Design a protein with these regions (language model features):
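Extended, well-folded catalytic/binding cores that form a central cleft or groove in large enzyme
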Residues: 2-710
Length: 710
C-alpha cells in the first residue's frame, strides 16, 4: 500500500553510533589497531566473537601470505596514497592519529627513511604500482612488519603477482596481514559522502569518452557504493531509473553483492537478537540517480548557511578560506587571509544551523555568542572573587588555581569553574562562525544574491509557467543591471531560465546579448572591453560556452526541462501563509541580535528566509519512500539482492503486489557532481538520509565542467 504525507523514518538521534561516518571511523580505528578484533575503540561496535569485523575483509584465506600474530595497540607508522589520505583526513586529525599510536604518517610515493623496529600500516588503492612499492619496502626491510590494507578489493591476479615479488626478495615474513577494507569513499559528515571522482560530469558526458572508459568509470562508482553498503552492514533494496548510467551502476553493484556475500556475513552477531530482528525488519533503500535529471540545482543560488559557504567562499574538504578586511585607526584597510576547519560533528552551532536559512544562522550566532560571553564573564567574576586565579598554561589552555587559604566557596563554584573551559571553547567556535558569517554576508550583500535566489526559485517552481514573456522580462532586467551580481551570477540565472522554462532559443539568445551589452561587449563577441575585467571576461566566455552546451542538449531532448518535472510538485514553503509577518519579525530580531558587522546588511537578505522548495532528488526519494502511485515508484527498477531469481529484479508490474519491508534509512546517490544545496534540501525534508555523489562541486566549478563540453 502506498502511504501519504511526509516520509517517516527512524530518527538517527536514537543511535548516535549509527551514522555512516561513525561506522567508517570505527573501521579505520580497527585498521590502525592492526585489524585486531579484540581492540575496541570508544563507541566501537566490535564483537570479538564473530572473528571478523565491519568493513574489513581478511583475505589471508588465500594462504599465499602468512598471517601475523594478534597485535595489540602499539606505536606504528601510517603509509597511504593520495586517495586514502583524502579518506583519512575528515575522520582523524594529527592528534587523533597519535592517540591511536600513529607516530608518523607518510605518502607511499614519498622518500621514506628506514625505521626497522616499528610496524607500518599501509592504506592504499590495490594497484600494480602501489604493490610494487610495498614489495620494494619489504625487500629493503624499511619496517618491522607490513600490515596491508586495500581501500577496495585486491584482485587475485595482483595478489599473486605481489606474492611472487616478496618471495623473490625473501621478504615474505615482513608481510603480517592483507585486508580488503571496503572504504572507497570520503565521508565528510555523519551522513554525507563523495567518491572523490573529479571532473565526473565531463567524463560521463563527453562524446569522446570511449565505451571502455565509461565501463571502467561505472565500475569505479559501483565499487564505491559497495563500500558504502558494506559499512552500513545491511543489504539494501536498490531503485534506479531504467537505462543509462544508473541502471549500469545498479546492475554492477548487484553482481558485486552476489559475488561477495562475506562482506555482509561479518555483521551477524554484532547486536543482540532484538536489535538484529529490528534491523532485519527494516531495509536500507539505495536510490541511484543521474545528474542530468536535474541540472538546475548545481547552479542555482541558495539560501542555507552551509551551501552559501560553499558557493561564495573557498570551501573544500570541510576547510573554508576567505579574505577579511579591517581598518586601522589611520583609516588604512588591511586584508588578512583566514582559514578554518569546519566539523559539523564536533561543532554544535554548525550542526544545528548548516541547513538553516542564512538569516536564521546570523540571528542564532548573535544570541548564542551574547549568552556565552555573559555566562563566561559571570563565572570568571565568581571564580576570582572566590579565591581562584586564572592563568595560561604552556599549551595555551586556560587553567584556574584555587587559593588554598580561601574558603573557596563551594561545590557550585568548583563546578562552575570546571565548566569554563568548555564555555571558552564554545565561545571560540561561535566567534569563528561570526567571521564566516561576516564573509558570507559581504558577498551576499555586494552581489545582491537574494534577488537572483528569488527569481531562480520562482522559475524553478513554475511560477512563470503561464507567463513566459514576464519571465524573460524579469531575467533580462536583472542580468542587464550592471550594479547587480557578478558575471557568474548572471550566467547561472540564464541557465536556470533555459532549463526551467520552455522559452525558445531566440529568447535565451536575446537575454545573453542583453547581458553582454551591459558588460561592455558587443553581441557579436568582440574582444575585452575596458568596462569588464579580465577575470570577468574569462567567466563570461566560460559561461557562454556552458549555455551553448545546455541549449544543444535541450534542443536534442537529451535533458528534461524542470518546468515539466515540477508542474505536479507542490512547493514546500516553511512558514507559508503568514510568511510576510514571520519574515519581518525574524529579520527585525536578527538585526537587533546579530553582532555589529553582520547587522549592517541583514535587511538585504530577508528574502532568503522561508522559501524552501523541494529539489528533484528530494521529490524522487520521497515518492519512493512513500511508494506513491504514478511516480518514480512505478517506473524505477526494483532490485533486491535477497531475491535469488532474475538477478534480484522484481518486475515493475509486481512491485505493488509484493510485501515491502519498511525503509530503515535512505542512501540517495547522484552519478556525477553533487552539491551542498542538494544535501541540505534532502535533510530539510527527510530524516535519516545519507547523501552521496561522485564529487561535491561549487556552482562555478560545475559551470566550468559544462563549459568544457561545448
Amino acid at each position: 500500500m502506498a502511504s501519504s504525507g511526509p516520509p517517516t523514518l527512524p530518527s538517527p538521534a536514537s543511535d548516535p553510533l549509527s551514522s555512516l561516518k561513525r561506522k567508517q571511523l570505527n573501521s579505520v580505528t580497527r585498521m590502525l589497531a592492526l585489524n585486531n578484533v579484540a581492540s575496541k575503540s570508544p563507541g566501537s561496535t566490535a564483537n570479538t566473537s564473530t572473528g571478523a569485523e565491519a568493513s574489513s575483509v581478511d583475505i589471508g584465506s588465500y594462504n599465499m601470505l602468512p598471517r601475523g600474530p594478534p597485535a595489540q595497540n602499539q606505536w606504528k607508522i601510517l603509509i597511504y596514497d593520495k586517495t586514502c589520505r583524502s579518506i583519512i583526513s575528515p575522520l582523524l586529525s594529527v592528534s587523533d592519529l597519535r592517540r591511536r599510536g600513529v607516530t608518523l604518517h607518510l605518502l607511499l610515493d614519498s622518500e621514506r627513511e628506514p625505521i626497522p623496529d616499528v610496524p607500518a600500516v599501509y592504506f592504499v588503492e590495490p594497484t600494480r604500482s602501489n604493490l610494487s612499492i610495498i614489495a620494494q619496502d619489504c625487500a629493503l626491510g624499511l619496517y618491522k612488519a607490513a600490515y596491508l590494507n586495500f581501500v577496495t578489493r585486491l584482485d587475485r591476479s595482483l595478489l599473486e603477482e605481489f606474492a611472487r615479488l616478496v618471495v623473490q626478495s625473501n621478504s615474505v615474513e615482513k608481510v603480517a596481514l592483507v585486508f580488503d577494507q571496503y572504504l572507497d569513499y570520503v565521508c565528510l559528515e555523519r551522513n554525507l559522502f563523495t567518491l572523490n571522482k573529479t571532473n565526473s560530469y565531463v567524463l560521463y558526458n563527453d562524446p569522446t569518452t570511449t565505451e571502455h572508459m565509461m565501463e571502467r568509470a561505472m565500475l569505479d562508482v559501483a565499487n564505491g557504493l559497495l563500500s558504502v553498503i558494506s559499512t552500513i552492514g545491511q543489504l539494501p533494496v536498490i531503485r534506479c531509473a531504467k537505462g543509462g548510467a544508473p541502471e549500469m551502476v545498479a546492475r554492477k553493484l548487484m553482481k558485486m553483492i552476489s559475488d561477495r556475500p562475506m562482506i555482509f556475513d561479518r555483521h551477524k552477531g554484532r547486536a543482540g537478537a532484538a536489535s538484529a530482528s529490528a534491523a532485519a525488519h527494516r531495509r536500507p533503500l539505495m536510490v541511484i540517480m543521474d545528474r542530468n535529471t536535474d541540472l538546475i540545482t548545481p547552479v542555482q543560488h541558495t539560501s542555507t548557511y552551509q551551501a552559501l559557504i560553499d558557493d561564495v567562499l573557498t570551501h573544500k574538504g570541510n576547510r573554508v578560506e576567505f579574505e577579511s578586511k579591517t581598518e586601522d585607526a589611520a583609516g588604512r584597510v588591511k586584508t588578512m587571509g583566514k582559514r578554518f576547519d569546519l566539523d559539523a560533528d564536533e561543532d554544535p552551532f554548525y550542526s544545528r544551523h548548516k541547513f538553516n536559512p542564512f538569516p536564521e544562522a546570523i540571528e542564532s550566532n548573535g544570541v548564542e555568542l551574547q549568552n556565552v560571553t555573559k555566562k563566561t564573564e559571570e563565572i570568571r567574576s565568581k571564580a576570582i572573587g572566590g579565591g581562584v586565579s586564572e592563568r595560561e598554561s604552556q599549551s595555551g589552555a586556560v587553567v584556574f588555581d584555587a587559593d588554598a587559604s580561601a574558603s573557596a566557596g563551594t561545590n557550585d563554584l568548583a563546578t562552575a569553574v570546571d565548566s569554563l573551559p568548555a564555555l571558552i571553547e564554545r565561545k571560540r567556535q561561535l566567534e569563528v562562525h561570526t567571521s564566516i558569517l561576516q564573509a558570507v554576508m559581504t558577498q551576499v550583500a555586494s552581489r545582491d544574491i537574494p534577488q537572483f535566489y528569488e527569481l531562480e526559485s520562482a522559475l524553478a517552481t513554475g511560477s512563470y509557467k503561464n507567463d513566459q514573456s514576464k519571465a524573460k522580462r524579469d531575467v533580462m532586467e536583472l542580468v542587464t543591471d550592471a550594479t547587480k551580481g557578478k558575471v557568474a551570477d548572471k550566467i547561472r540565472l540564464i541557465i536556470v531560465f533555459c532549463l526551467a522554462t520552455t522559452a525558445p532559443g531566440s529568447d535565451i539568445d536575446e537575454v545573453v546579448c542583453g547581458m553582454r551589452d551591459s558588460l561592455g561587449n558587443s553581441a557579436a563577441g568582440g574582444g575585452p572591453s575596458p568596462k569588464i575585467a579580465r577575470e570577468d571576461e574569462e567567466k563570461l566566455s566560460q559561461g557562454l560556452a556552458a549555455i551553448t552546451y545546455l541549449k544543444r542538449l535541450r534542443s536534442m531532448n537529451m535533458i528534461t526541462t524542470m518546468s515539466d518535472q515540477l508542474s505536479a510538485v507542490e512547493s514546500s514553503y516553511a512558514g507559508a501563509g503568514a510568511s510576510g509577518d514571520m519574515l519581518s519579525t525574524l529579520m527585525k530580531s536578527a538585526t537587533n541580535q546579530a553582532t555589529g558587522l553582520l547587522a549592517k546588511a541583514t535587511e538585504r537578505v530577508s528574502s532568503m528566509l522561508g522559501k524552501i522548495h523541494k529539489h528533484h532528488v528530494t521529490c524522487v526519494v520521497e515518492n519512493l519512500i512513500n511508494q506513491k502511485p504514478g511516480t518514480e515508484d512505478d517506473e524505477y527498477l526494483y532490485l533486491d539482492p535477497r531475491i535469488s531469481s532474475r538477478g534480484g529484479e522484481v518486475n515493475l508490474s509486481e512491485v505493488r503486489q509484493i510485501a515491502r519491508a519498511p525503509v530503515g534509512e535512505v542512501v540517495a546517490f547522484v552519478i556525477g557532481p553533487g552539491s551542498y544545496s542538494e544535501h541540505a534540501n534532502l535533510n530539510q525534508q527527510i530524516d535519516n538520509v545519507i547523501y552521496g555523489c561522485c564529487e561535491l562541486v561549487s556552482p562555478e566549478a560545475f559551470l566550468k565542467q559544462l563549459a568544457s563540453l561545448q
